[in-house]
Structure formats: structure tokens, C-alpha cells
Amino acid sequence: MVKYCIYTENVNRDLIESILNENLESFSIQDQIGVWKGTKEKSLKIEVLGTYQDDHIKYVAGLIKVLNNQQAVLVTCERLENNWLI
């Protein structure tokens, strides 16, 4: 299993959620404060657990980047060794 995190500015949240619902089976969203080039901004951390292909997550992040007219959206990927769904 893989944990992906997408970090983006907290604007167009309803449209971001629509993109996520259309492209992912499940996800969670956390409100955060981020800093980009010295400027503090409200941001979102989108966490996705699953067996998605990396390119699919990059595609989703790209849709969010275009929607929010951002220079960059950070995506992290962590391979999980042990996990349980109880």
C-alpha cells in the first residue's frame, strides 16, 4: 500500500473535492497553514491511501494545480510496509 499526500492552497475547495471524488475511491483532507516563498497561506493536505499508480496521483495533482492557478503542488509518496484494515 502507498500513502500519497498532495499539498495545495485552500481555494476552490468544493471543486477540489469534486476532482478527488471523480478520480479517487477514498481520501482525507486536513486544513493547514503553509508557506510558499515566504508568504503564509491557508493550505490543504490531501491524503490518499491505496494501490494507485504514481502517474494517476500526479494527474490528479495536476488538475488541482491548474484549477488553483498555482506554480507548483507538492506530492509526496510513502510506501507502507505494514498496514491493517480492521
Tell where the protein language model's regions lie, with residue ranges.
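Positively charged, small/polar-rich N-terminal and surface patches that mediate targeting and assembly
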Residues: 1-86
